[in-house]
Amino acid sequence: MEEFKNIFEGLDVAYGQHQSEGKRADGKQEGKSYIVKKIVTDDLWQSHLDGEGPSLGIIPIMADNTSKWGCIDIDTYPIDYRKIINSIRKLKLPLVPCRSKSGGLHLFLFFKNPVSAKLIREKLRE
């Protein structure tokens, strides 16, 4: 758990949650997402990693407007995962692809040290 907490370090006074409500015809999971203004606890992390309860959405931007990671959320269906991953490899982009809970694709960009959230947003838009 500590490795995940370090990799996905973010705001510690609030987090996102999502309650699934089924699938659309195109395969995307539907549901409600919202912000919970409470401390992110080890119990929340462990429940999330165990696949229990509502999801835990770490807010990447910390209180000082820096972040150690960013994410591109691709929710265009159908998704050709192989084509996107091959493009990432071909272009040698520093992105880590992961299938999202909704059936989409998350492309993560990680940093060893916190950097300006504005810079991360600019780089992910390039």
Where are the regions a protein language model picked out?
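DNA replication initiation on ssDNA origins
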Residues: M1-W69, P78-N86
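Hydrophobic side chains in beta-strands
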Residues: I58-P60, I74, L109
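Histidine-centered divalent-metal-coordination microenvironment in nucleic-acid enzymes
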Residues: C71, L95-R121
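Active-site-adjacent loop/helix surface patches within enzyme catalytic domains
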Residues: C71-I74, I79-R99
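Helical (often loop-to-helix) elements that flank the catalytic cores of nucleotide-handling enzymes
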Residues: R82-K90, F110-E126
